[in-house]
Amino acid sequence: MFLLSGYEYFLGFLLIAAAVPILALVTNLIVAPKGRNGERKLTYESGMEPIGGAWIQFNIRYYMFALVFVIFDVETVFLYPWAVAFNRLGLLAFIEALIFIAILVIALAYAWRKGALEWS
């Protein structure tokens, strides 16, 4: 019996997964127009001419909101599998989840107290 007999489907999938992007790039090179005129380099903004410059300075407060969002989004990612398997897990897993949630509540209170959630 051949050693790799169970991997034919995987190898086929791997070849197709490699061939599709290569085929798309080659098709683009063949079909795409070759001209590089000035209109092609212009910015397209919903079919209208862009107004103003694109280089504006964002307020640093957006960074804090994004950071707090990412922290609590990751919390959701970690708590979802726990919630799905809640019936099969024991008391120890429940206590661990409560400790995890308590740490995140403390982090939220800290961010709130430091003013990370205020826009003034």
From Swiss-Prot:
<keyword id="KW-0813">Transport</keyword>
<keyword id="KW-0618">Plastoquinone</keyword>
<keyword id="KW-0472">Membrane</keyword>
<dbReference type="GO" id="GO:0030964">
    <property type="term" value="C:NADH dehydrogenase complex"/>
</dbReference>
<feature type="transmembrane region" description="Helical">
    <location>
        <begin position="10"/>
        <end position="30"/>
    </location>
</feature>
<keyword id="KW-0520">NAD</keyword>
<dbReference type="GO" id="GO:0008137">
    <property type="term" value="F:NADH dehydrogenase (ubiquinone) activity"/>
</dbReference>
<dbReference type="InterPro" id="IPR000440">
    <property type="entry name" value="NADH_UbQ/plastoQ_OxRdtase_su3"/>
</dbReference>
<dbReference type="Pfam" id="PF00507">
    <property type="entry name" value="Oxidored_q4"/>
</dbReference>
<keyword id="KW-1278">Translocase</keyword>
<keyword id="KW-1133">Transmembrane helix</keyword>
<keyword id="KW-0793">Thylakoid</keyword>
<keyword id="KW-0874">Quinone</keyword>
<feature type="transmembrane region" description="Helical">
    <location>
        <begin position="64"/>
        <end position="84"/>
    </location>
</feature>
<dbReference type="InterPro" id="IPR038430">
    <property type="entry name" value="NDAH_ubi_oxred_su3_sf"/>
</dbReference>
<dbReference type="GO" id="GO:0031676">
    <property type="term" value="C:plasma membrane-derived thylakoid membrane"/>
</dbReference>
<comment type="similarity">
    <text>Belongs to the complex I subunit 3 family.</text>
</comment>
<dbReference type="GO" id="GO:0048038">
    <property type="term" value="F:quinone binding"/>
</dbReference>
<dbReference type="InterPro" id="IPR023043">
    <property type="entry name" value="NAD(P)H_OxRDtase_bac/plastid"/>
</dbReference>
<comment type="function">
    <text>NDH-1 shuttles electrons from an unknown electron donor, via FMN and iron-sulfur (Fe-S) centers, to quinones in the respiratory and/or the photosynthetic chain. The immediate electron acceptor for the enzyme in this species is believed to be plastoquinone. Couples the redox reaction to proton translocation, and thus conserves the redox energy in a proton gradient. Cyanobacterial NDH-1 also plays a role in inorganic carbon-concentration.</text>
</comment>
<dbReference type="GO" id="GO:0019684">
    <property type="term" value="P:photosynthesis, light reaction"/>
</dbReference>
<keyword id="KW-0521">NADP</keyword>
<comment type="subunit">
    <text>NDH-1 can be composed of about 15 different subunits; different subcomplexes with different compositions have been identified which probably have different functions.</text>
</comment>
<feature type="transmembrane region" description="Helical">
    <location>
        <begin position="89"/>
        <end position="109"/>
    </location>
</feature>
<keyword id="KW-0812">Transmembrane</keyword>
<protein>
    <recommendedName>
        <fullName>NAD(P)H-quinone oxidoreductase subunit 3</fullName>
        <ecNumber>7.1.1.-</ecNumber>
    </recommendedName>
</protein>
